[in-house]
Amino acid sequence: MAEGLVLKGIMRAHTDIVTAIATPIDNSDIIVTASRDKSIILWKLTKDDKSYGVAQRRLTGHSHFVEDVVLSSDGQFALSGSWDGELRLWDLATGETTRRFVGHTKDVLSVAFSTDNRQIVSASRDRTIKLWNTLGECKYTISEGDGHKEWVSCVRFSPNTLVPTIVSASWDKTVKVWNLQNCKLRNSLVGHSGYLNTVAVSPDGSLCASGGKDGVILLWDLAEGKKLYSLEAGSIIHSLCFSPNRYWLCAATENSIRIWDLESKSVVEDLKVDLKSEAEKNEGGVGTGNQKKVIYCTSLNWSADGSTLFSGYTDGVVRVWGIGRY
């Protein structure tokens, strides 16, 4: 019996591209999504046939597209970054903004929490990476010199707490690895031929994967700063994530969601959306007229137990895939 992914359900509430999905580390029945509709939605997962989850709360306050969202490890707070140039910390119990982080001079494209939630990092079109405390104070800005020469599209903390590390990806085609203790450059990873949209760090902190315009995923050894190998995705890569419990890497591309087994370096899954069958299911057997439109996945994240893959699309829909056997 092979393991594969099947579409378990869909979640509708956003009215524009779903830019990011955050899942709780305790596997509780919530997720948080961000969108170009300028809102963040807290979902309660019901796992019903008709709808996999319901929008419990919509967090509003950003004045432009929300580009990224992450959850604190206790699941109490969400942190977002927006094209309005700000980060916001949200109390999920009340839906209120508890902190605004002001300092970037252009769109914020990416945000992340350190493992202990005491540090926050953000990346922007102003070409800087900023390190903040949870009070909203900017403690350090990585800019000129070793900094990126173009938009910084993605920034992530390594889960390896022994060697505190930040990894960033940029439109200057490089991935940079930073020592968190002194914010100094450890390695500059060169090999891509186009701008980068995304970087992901493996659960053990040993690897990172990067992708973007050139349609090639590069895998890097984080400790050594060396390229290990490449995987051909075949079209622009918008998001990457590692499975928490299988040696799998998932890529959201403009063609499909592609999943590789990193041991064999083979594609185990290539997930495409069937709008026709989705419409029929939704309308109770009557297809709708929008099956011609091209949609693709822009964001994805696994549940903490690795059983469920949440994927956000350009049509504002969150599609939920579950591990099945066939």
UniProtKB/Swiss-Prot annotation:
GO aspect biological process, one term: positive regulation of signal transduction
GO cellular component: cytosol; nucleolus; ribonucleoprotein complex; ribosome
UniProt keyword Ribonucleoprotein, yes or no: yes
Each WD repeat, start to end: 13-53, 61-100, 103-142, 147-188, 191-230, 232-270, 290-326
Tissues where the protein occurs: Widely expressed.
InterPro entries: G-protein_beta_WD-40_rep, RACK1-like, WD40/YVTN_repeat-like_dom_sf, WD40_repeat_CS, WD40_repeat_dom_sf, WD40_rpt
CDD domains: WD40
Changes seen on gene knockout: No visible phenotype under normal growth condition.
GO MF term set: MAP-kinase scaffold activity; ribosome binding; translation regulator activity
Role: Minor component of the RACK1 regulatory proteins that play a role in multiple signal transduction pathways. Involved in multiple hormone responses and developmental processes. MAPK cascade scaffolding protein involved in the protease IV and ArgC signaling pathway but not the flg22 pathway.
Quaternary structure note: Homodimer and heterodimer with RACK1A or RACK1B. Interacts with GB1, MEKK1, MKK4, MKK5, MPK3 and MPK6, but not with GPA1 or MPK4.
Family the entry assigns: Belongs to the WD repeat G protein beta family. Ribosomal protein RACK1 subfamily.
Protein name: Small ribosomal subunit protein RACK1x
Species in which this protein is naturally found: Arabidopsis thaliana (Mouse-ear cress)
